[in-house]
Design a protein with these regions (language model features):
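N-terminal pre-Walker A segment at the start of P-loop NTPase domains
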Residues: 393-415
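Active-site anion/phosphate-binding pocket segments in diverse small-molecule metabolic enzymes
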Residues: 1-19, 27, 69, 95-97, ...
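Short beta-strand-centered segment that lines the nucleotide-binding/catalytic pocket of NTP-utilizing
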Residues: 449-465, 476
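The conserved Walker
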Residues: 432
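Conserved lysine of the Walker
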Residues: 436
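Short phosphate-coordinating micro-motif centered on Lys-Gly-acidic
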Residues: 487-563
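Active-site-proximal beta-alpha core segment in soluble small-molecule metabolic enzymes
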Residues: 5, 10-12, 30-217
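Hydrophobic anchor at the beta1->P-loop junction of P-loop NTPases
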Residues: 426-428
């Protein structure tokens, strides 16, 4: 039996949150493209799943640290199908003596951080072309040290490195210049303007010496959000794509990671007894406790002992005593407490350490005396199962999805529209204000039709001409099409056939061929199903974090099934 079959802890990764964050950075960077940094296993989120999810969301390129990461990523993407094969991947950490033949063959763009690296690259690229291992110049990105003093060609080596690479454009294609900000999370730092000036000078120097450098990038997460002047042709965000805003830019990023573990037992600790090693906590009264299956062997730092809180069934409880190798203890409350929250915690319940509820990643980082970047990479080891939620939905079968914002609803609609065929009837149901028209706006974008999608409140039926896909859209309020009231619906027992619906459309001078369009019918249940044998019923319901319907909440559950 695989260990993960009996796992007691999970790292839950929300792919919808990642897609949302990608869209935030696309909007901030436009018209520049986005290179997503997916080093360190996508900041511990699982690169094999996260990278294609980012590409599906609109990321143009991927960046990693090491050549090993790059080769793994290329193989993983190749396994997913042809549409991912040509994804540009850049890696910037390697040694001058490393053999690069397999890197060249995989089409990886290598970063050049020193003169020694440039010499090694030129030598190996010349040999690869001479021996026909490659048929075109190999791709590289010239790294310049603008002030971080870590990686990047130093000022002392800069001219010689540029001249060397400019003399060997027959075997090395320098795609651009890249650098890294030292203090972009401190917008007022003078270092930012200094690095910006040096980067612009480096690009100009390259172009004056015969290197066109068409694709340049220096903006990390905070620079993308705070310094639009540094967008250039690409931005290169990392931690922000996973929902962390290190500069407090105020954008609506959604953290994608939740760490949780099972409660394995509960007990009553008598007054005066100690808990965990060295008895750093003692019961001041008879106290009910729970043991949670997570410890420092799983990446939970001992430094948070007695400081952290966990969330179980929506209620926050303090962790007590020392963090152990495999487990922690949580105080539930007085043993004689008859409140449901105290006694309701049972073995098998999930205790959330940080993430979607309770303690945020930023708050946990403060408790641990570190930064959110490190917290993301803390959970580790085979005892924690990585679980993915959301991602690109498959509308070929029945399913459901929870969306948090109107933008997410449009994006879901766009994914739906991209998968629909001509002749499909989509029946949209849900209360007023649920988001039916918002979903339709996204669906229209996925179909690529012409014209602005508006609510059918005033115009009962609206046609949208086909775009490149050759599929049009017919958007209607189906109840009003047949003279019914939304609140009352279709009269009980009334039978509606295909001809009645077509006659109603013809009476409004709508002459679209149903087989050439997608029909989206708001309030369409019991009305438009006779139009096609391909009917997708979509229900939108309001929701909230607690699960109860909440008119003020943007959270929606979208459920679909084929009729």
């Amino acid at each position: 039996m695989n260990m993960s079959d009996r796992h007691l802890a999970e790292l839950v990764v929300d792919l919808d949150a990642i897609a949302h964050n990608v869209r935030v950075f696309q909007e901030a960077a436009a018209p520049a493209g986005v290179m997503a940094v997916v080093k360190a296993d996508a900041y511990n989120h699982g690169v094999d799943v996260v990278a294609p999810a980012m590409l599906d969301a609109g990321v143009e390129q991927l960046g990693v640290a090491t050549l090993g990461e790059a080769l793994h990523l290329r193989g993983s993407l190749n396994d997913l199908g042809e549409r991912y094969h040509s994804t540009p991947i850049t890696a910037w950490m390697w040694m001058p003596g490393d053999e690069l033949a397999d890197v060249f063959a995989a089409g990886i763009t290598v970063g050049v951080p020193s003169l020694a690296h440039a010499k090694s690259l030129v030598e190996q690229a010349e040999r690869a072309l001479r021996e026909t291992q490659v048929s075109a110049p190999v791709r590289a990105s010239l790294m310049v040290d603008t002030g971080l003093s870590r990686s990047g060609v130093s000022p002392a080596e800069w001219q010689q490195t540029v001249e060397l690479l400019a003399a060997h454009t027959d075997c090395v294609d320098i795609t651009g210049v890249m650098s890294h900000m030292a203090s972009a999370d401190e917008p007022q730092s003078e270092a930012n303007d200094l690095q910006a000036t040096r980067f612009a000078q480096a690009i100009e120097f390259c172009r004056n010496h015969g290197l066109p450098v068409p694709c340049n990038h220096i903006a990390n997460t905070p620079a993308t959000l705070n310094r639009p002047d540094l967008a250039y042709e690409l931005v290169r965000p990392g931690v922000g794509l996973y929902g962390i805003d290190p500069a407090g830019a105020g954008v609506e990023l959604r953290p994608a990671m939740t760490l949780r573990a099972r409660v394995i037992t509960t007990r009553v600790v008598p007054k005066g007894e100690g808990v965990s090693y060295s008895h750093t906590w003692r019961a001041q009264r008879d106290t009910r406790t729970a043991v949670v299956a997570l410890g420092y062997a799983d990446g939970l730092p001992r430094s948070v002992s007695g400081k952290m809180q966990v969330t179980i069934n929506g209620k926050v409880y303090p962790q007590i005593g020392r963090v152990c190798m495999d487990q922690i203890v949580v105080e539930l409350g007085p043993a004689d407490d008859t409140e449901a929250e105290t006694s309701a915690v049972q073995p098998g319940d999930w205790a959330v350490i940080f993430g979607e509820v309770g303690t945020s990643i930023d708050e946990f980082a403060e408790l641990a005396g570190t930064i959110s970047y490190e917290v993301l990479t803390m959970p580790r080891g085979p005892r924690i199962a990585r679980v993915f939620r959301g991602g690109k939905p498959d509308f070929s079968g029945d399913g459901s999805r929870t969306v948090a914002t109107a933008d997410d609803m449009r994006h879901l609609g766009e994914q739906l529209g991209a998968q629909l065929e001509a002749g499909t009837v989509v029946v949209l149901s849900g209360p007023l204000g649920a988001g039916k028209t918002t979903l339709t706006q996204g669906l229209a974008a996925g179909l690529g039709v012409k014209g602005r999608v508006q609510s059918p409140t005033f115009t009962i039926v609206r046609t949208h001409r086909a775009g490149q896909r050759g599929i049009g859209l017919l958007h209607m309020d189906a109840y009003r099409l047949l003279g019914a009231d939304v609140d009352e619906g279709i009269e009980p027992g009334r039978h509606i056939d295909r001809n009645e619906v077509l006659d109603a459309l013809e009476s409004l001078d709508i002459d679209a061929d149903i087989d050439d369009v997608v029909v989206v019918a708001e309030w369409g249940r019991g009305v438009v199903e006779p139009l096609s044998d391909k009917v997708l019923d979509v229900q939108i319901d309001r929701g909230s974090v607690s699960g109860a319907a909440d008119a003020a909440s943007e959270i929606r559950t979208v459920t679909w099934h084929w009729g």
